[in-house]
Amino acid sequence: MTPSISWGLLLLAGLCCMVPSFLAEDVQETDTSQKDQSPASHEIATNLGDFAISLYRELVHQSNTSNIFFSPVSIATAFAMLSLGSKGDTHTQILEGLQFNLTQTSEADIHKSFQHLLQTLNRPDSELQLSTGNGLFVNNDLKLVEKFLEEAKNHYQAEVFSVNFAESEEAKKVINDFVEKGTQGKIVEAVKELDQDTVFALANYILFKGKWKKPFDPENTEEAEFHVDKSTTVKVPMMMLSGMLDVHHCSILSSWVLLMDYAGNASAVFLLPEDGKMQHLEQTLNKELISKILLNRRRRLVQIHIPRLSISGDYNLKTLMSPLGITRIFNNGADLSGITEENAPLKLSKAVHKAVLTIDETGTEAAAATVFEAVPMSMPPILRFDHPFLFIIFEEHTQSPIFVGKVVDPTHK
């Protein structure tokens, strides 16, 4: 007979993304032939693209008037790792909710894809800091299934910590210290409280630090207006950059598209909709269009103005993932029997995702560097990001969307 007690599991998907616009030496154009074309990379990029858009649309549905910022990679990695210990409908819901077609892709290939992605993200890069971490926090009297532990370590590079959840303050400190250290102090107090029945916690973080290949000069940053909506205007520090940039207008999306590279293996796509076309952009954008944007670069002389900003996201993944079909794991019908050898059933009592993004200029020494670029001697057209826009940050090798955001009001952190 199944015991009446139900143990709780905490899932924490945390992210820190710092994008300082330091001045850097100019570098050569990205060679698209060097992108990782392995089947594992293609598989994970395709599914993460679908998952990112589904998740974004659900966030818009829940709140269309606030900034959005999250990491599809962080959330998907945490749930995929959890699927290692799930069975039955719980297992199927997780993987299908992550947009995997289980009739076409084997479970082994799914986890190999995540393993390859995490290895790629954690690859040393002298110009770009991009690292991930997964922590398993286990009550000191709870015995985990050895197969789950081995696969979590092998595929997801998970670290295992023994904690006493009966001492909730100490348990919180262990988890928060792991996330704070991994995000270099940018995410603190990721866990504010623990349910009294929690016996197992899973935490994932991603840290990103990048420098623009074509940098902004802080001397050119000026206060300017940003139109939040038709009746609301705020003052923001607006960065400016002139030169040969990847900018074009996409008639399908009714939006201007700006593609900016980081020094290292990452790039950002900014999507600025025409007046009144934000909803059209959000409904039309898909992974096929994003792929075309990344492949079809169109350099032109242009002057761009974009806000210096810091935004964050703090989401309850239970309300966010349920509309995507991931429901069983959160209720008493959850089957996570592949995680623990204990008889008492385990369910996901809480799942949170925290994200932080900063785009800014830093330091006077950086401003002293010089970038040389030949440009035509004419006044460039001007593109102002002075009303709500979207952005996606990609890892170049796999073309996986690691961060997705919407800036509605740059003054709201």
UniProtKB/Swiss-Prot annotation:
Subcellular localization(s) per the UniProt record: Secreted
Site description Reactive bond, residues in chain: M377, S378
Domain of life: Eukaryota
Any GO CC annotation of this UniProt entry: extracellular space
GO molecular function annotations of the record: serine-type endopeptidase inhibitor activity
GO biological process: acute-phase response; in utero embryonic development; protein N-linked glycosylation; response to cytokine; response to peptide hormone
Keyword Cell membrane: no
Stretch list, region RCL: 368-387
Pfam families, A to Z: Serpin
Keywords noted in UniProt: Acute phase, Glycoprotein, Protease inhibitor, Secreted, Serine protease inhibitor, Signal
Range of residues in the leader sequence: 1-24
Known glycosylation sites: N64, N101, N265
CDD domains cross-referenced by the UniProt entry: serpinA1_A1AT
Family: Belongs to the serpin family.
Note: Murine alpha-1-antitrypsin is represented by a cluster of up to 6 individual Serpina1-related genes. The precise complement of Serpina1-related genes present varies according to the strain of the animal.
Function: Inhibitor of serine proteases. Its primary target is elastase, but it also has a moderate affinity for plasmin and thrombin.
Entry's free-text remark on domains: The reactive center loop (RCL) extends out from the body of the protein and directs binding to the target protease. The protease cleaves the serpin at the reactive site within the RCL, establishing a covalent linkage between the carboxyl group of the serpin reactive site and the serine hydroxyl of the protease. The resulting inactive serpin-protease complex is highly stable. Variability within the reactive center loop (RCL) sequences of Serpina1-related genes may determine target protease specificity.
Name of this protein: Alpha-1-antitrypsin 1-2
Gene behind this protein: Serpina1b
